[in-house]
C-alpha cells in the first residue's frame, strides 16, 4: 500500500485532451509526456480523459490507453489513479479512483469492490472537507481550484493560496492535494500552509521541458 501523503507530493493529471501535438497521435504524446514525468519524479498519475479532443467517445481506445498508462506507472512504482470512471478503474486494476462531489459516492465505490482502491474526493468548501473528513472511505482530499483554470470547462470559484491553511486550522486532518492553476512558484506556500502536495495538468503537459517542469514543482 502506498503512503498517501508521500503520493500526493507531485500529482500529475492528464488525458489526451491535455496533450496537443499537430505532428503526432495525442495518445502517443500522452505516453511520451507521462514517461518523461515519471522519470523526472512525479509521485502519482491520474488518468483523466474527458471532454473535447479526448477518447471519451471511443471507450475501447480509451481503455487501451489507460492500460498503457497504468503499465508505465507500474514500471516506476507510482500510483495510477483513474478519474471518475469507477468501472474502468476496477476492470483494469488501477491503484485508485478520484471522484467529484456529484459523482459516485466513496461509500458506494467501497461496496463495489474488495480491492483496496485509493479513493480521492474533490472539495471546494470547508463544508465539503468536513464531510470528507468524516468518511472513512475517503483516503485523500483534492482541494481547489486554487486559481482560475482552463483545464476544466466548468469549475468552482477559486479558493486562493490561504484556504488550505484555514482548513488545517479548522481541524481538517486528512491528506490534502491542492489543485487548480498551480505553478512552481506557489508550491512552497501551499505546502507551508498545510497541503501535502500539489496536482497539476498543463504545468507539465504543456511544458517545453517536462523534466525541468517536474523538478521545479517538486
From Swiss-Prot:
Pathway annotation from the record: Cofactor biosynthesis; thiamine diphosphate biosynthesis; thiamine phosphate from 4-amino-2-methyl-5-diphosphomethylpyrimidine and 4-methyl-5-(2-phosphoethyl)-thiazole: step 1/1
Protein name stated in the entry: Thiamine-phosphate synthase
Residues that coordinate or bind 2-[(2R,5Z)-2-carboxy-4-methylthiazol-5(2H)-ylidene]ethyl phosphate: 149-151, 181, 201-202
Binding annotation for Mg(2+): 84, 103
UniProt catalytic activity: 2-[(2R,5Z)-2-carboxy-4-methylthiazol-5(2H)-ylidene]ethyl phosphate + 4-amino-2-methyl-5-(diphosphooxymethyl)pyrimidine + 2 H(+) = thiamine phosphate + CO2 + diphosphate; 2-(2-carboxy-4-methylthiazol-5-yl)ethyl phosphate + 4-amino-2-methyl-5-(diphosphooxymethyl)pyrimidine + 2 H(+) = thiamine phosphate + CO2 + diphosphate; 4-methyl-5-(2-phosphooxyethyl)-thiazole + 4-amino-2-methyl-5-(diphosphooxymethyl)pyrimidine + H(+) = thiamine phosphate + diphosphate
KW Transferase (keyword) present: yes
GO MF entry, a single one: magnesium ion binding
Record field: transmembrane: none
Biological process terms in GO annotation: thiamine biosynthetic process; thiamine diphosphate biosynthetic process
Alphabetical list of Pfam families matching this protein: TMP-TENI
Cofactor binding note from Swiss-Prot or TrEMBL: Binds 1 Mg(2+) ion per subunit.
Highest taxon, organism lineage: Bacteria
Cofactor: Mg(2+)
Leader sequence residues: none
UniProt-listed Enzyme Commission number(s): 2.5.1.3
UniProt entry keywords in alphabetical sequence: Magnesium, Metal-binding, Thiamine biosynthesis, Transferase
GO cellular component terms listed in the entry, alphabetical order: cytoplasm
Function: Condenses 4-methyl-5-(beta-hydroxyethyl)thiazole monophosphate (THZ-P) and 2-methyl-4-amino-5-hydroxymethyl pyrimidine pyrophosphate (HMP-PP) to form thiamine monophosphate (TMP).
InterPro entries: Aldolase_TIM, ThiamineP_synth_sf, ThiamineP_synth_TenI, TMP_synthase
Family: Belongs to the thiamine-phosphate synthase family.
Binding residue positions for 4-amino-2-methyl-5-(diphosphooxymethyl)pyrimidine: 46-50, 83, 122, 152
